A protein has these predicted regions:
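Acidic-basic catalytic patches of nuclease active cores, encompassing PD-(D/E)XK
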Residues: 1-32
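Catalytic cores of nucleic-acid endonucleases
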Residues: 2, 58-109
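Short, low-complexity, polybasic intrinsically disordered segments
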Residues: 104-124
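Active-site donor-binding loop signature of nucleotide-sugar glycosyltransferases
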Residues: 34, 56-58, 117
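Conserved catalytic cores of phosphodiester-cleaving nucleases, focusing on short active-site segments
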Residues: 41-64, 77
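Active-site metal-binding core of divalent-cation-utilizing nuclease and nuclease-like domains
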Residues: 24-51
Length: 124
């Protein structure tokens, strides 16, 4: 059980670092650990009219971080994003013109790395 709590704390730290990275680059954090009927979104962020669904992973490099987001999880995140878009009030003032799925991985040194538009719901 202690290992589970330790992993949970490490995951929360990674998400906090990811949110800080986003804020420092002009993104507004709309939600963290947003629960939807389709699943949880780690971070929902907005910059201008762009909305980003951000998945956060603790991994040593980009390759292993990308591999950690399996196709089933990508589909769940796409359904969760659809749910968010249908509920519009969580998006703040003004409409959204774009939606993308980003990946932020936090390496062994605790440094967050941002991969914008990491995947698309159609599998590309």
């Amino acid at each position: 059980m202690a290992r589970g709590r330790s992993s949970e704390r490490a995951g929360r730290r990674a998400e906090a670092l990811a949110a800080l990275r986003l804020r420092l680059t002009g993104w507004r954090i709309l939600a963290r650990r947003l629960k939807t009927p389709a699943g949880e979104i780690d971070i929902l962020a907005r910059r201008g009219r762009m909305l980003a669904v951000v998945e956060v992973k603790r991994r040593p490099d980009r390759a292993t971080a990308g591999e950690a987001v399996l196709p089933a999880q990508r589909r769940r995140l796409a359904r969760a994003a659809d749910w968010v878009l249908a509920r519009g009030e969580t998006l703040g003032a003004g409409g959204v013109e774009g939606l993308r799925f980003d990946l932020i991985w936090v390496d062994r040194l605790g440094l967050p790395h941002h991969l914008p538009d990491a995947w698309r719901p159609d599998g590309s």
